[in-house]
């Protein structure tokens, strides 16, 4: 049984993130949800919000991305998150994340 799952965050211009992970949480249309290795296959629509990637343990996320919404394809060994925009907000303060969120909303309304 795999202990990690491959995670990719894909935008039209680049692969914003790609690493093995212990767990990922993301914003679905019905609320936040988490994905662990060996998950059942599914495709989920995503809303704008934070994607948190847990690399070394499931208690502290090491990478956080603000996405503009999109879709994710999940299998037992990989997660592909396809989004129009993804901003790495891992090392930003709460107020800086709010500013980035506002900027992302302006971009997605055009």
Curated annotation (Swiss-Prot):
Protein location: Cell inner membrane
Membrane topology according to the record: Peripheral membrane protein
Record's keyword annotation contains Cytoplasm: no
Pfam family, one: ATP-synt_DE_N
Quaternary state and interactors: F-type ATPases have 2 components, CF(1) - the catalytic core - and CF(0) - the membrane proton channel. CF(1) has five subunits: alpha(3), beta(3), gamma(1), delta(1), epsilon(1). CF(0) has three main subunits: a, b and c.
Family statement: Belongs to the ATPase epsilon chain family.
Name under which the protein is recorded: ATP synthase epsilon chain
């Amino acid at each position: 049984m795999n202990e990690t799952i491959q995670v990719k965050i894909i935008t039209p211009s680049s692969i914003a993130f790609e690493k093995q992970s212990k767990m990922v949480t993301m914003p679905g249309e019905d609320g936040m949800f988490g994905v662990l290795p060996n998950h059942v296959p599914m495709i989920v629509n995503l809303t704008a919000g934070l994607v948190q990637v847990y690399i070394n343990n499931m208690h502290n996320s090491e990478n956080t991305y603000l996405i503009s919404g999109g879709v994710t394809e999940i299998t037992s060994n990989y997660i592909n998150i396809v989004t129009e925009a993804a901003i790495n907000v891992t090392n930003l303060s709460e107020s800086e994340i709010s500013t980035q969120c506002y900027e992302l909303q302006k971009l997605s309304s055009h």
